[in-house]
Amino acid sequence: MLARRFYKEVSVRDLGGVSGHTALVAGCGGWCGPYHDMVKHVPTIEAKFERVIIMPSSFDVSVPSVRSTLATTKALVFARERKSFDDICRLCDAKIAYDCAFFFDYRPYLRHGDGCLVSYRTDVESVLSVIPESNHDISKSCSSLDEWLWTIARHAVVRTDRAHVMIAAALLGKVVDYWTSSYHKVPAIADYALRSFPVRRIEPENQFRIAS
């Protein structure tokens, strides 16, 4: 999308002296109860740019600050699954599209894997009361995207409650068992974008029995 276009990449935490015509705000999970820091950044971005586009994200409008920010924004807002789109389409200028992770080139990482990667969240967005002993939260422990992708690639089955672990694993041809985090994000992405992949929702008691 940005090929042959001049652009500058900056952190939302370092917007001093930055301005321009169009700002693309990276898609993220920062629009929910545990993490909703985007609500304080978007007004600042809108004050500095003529046009703002929020890339595909999930939105929990039951969080008052998320709802109020979307209700007042002039940005074009992309949801990455149907539940979020249905929730925000009456609040703002909303569109729906696949998460940007679907457009990554995974071909260098395509491998036949072995064994099961258990990769559940270990942060405040987790709703699991018990984390399996074999758990490896690669989104926190891996030091690079390359390491993260190779960790997924060398396994045959992936069990997770992280959206991007689920997406990457599915696109790498893995069997994916997923569970939800603290809001609708993971099951909604699976339902909207991964129906043709070997992705299934399993209950926590089944996860722990299989993982033990």
Where do the protein language model's features map onto the residues?
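Active-site anion-handling motifs in enzyme catalytic cores
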Residues: 1-212
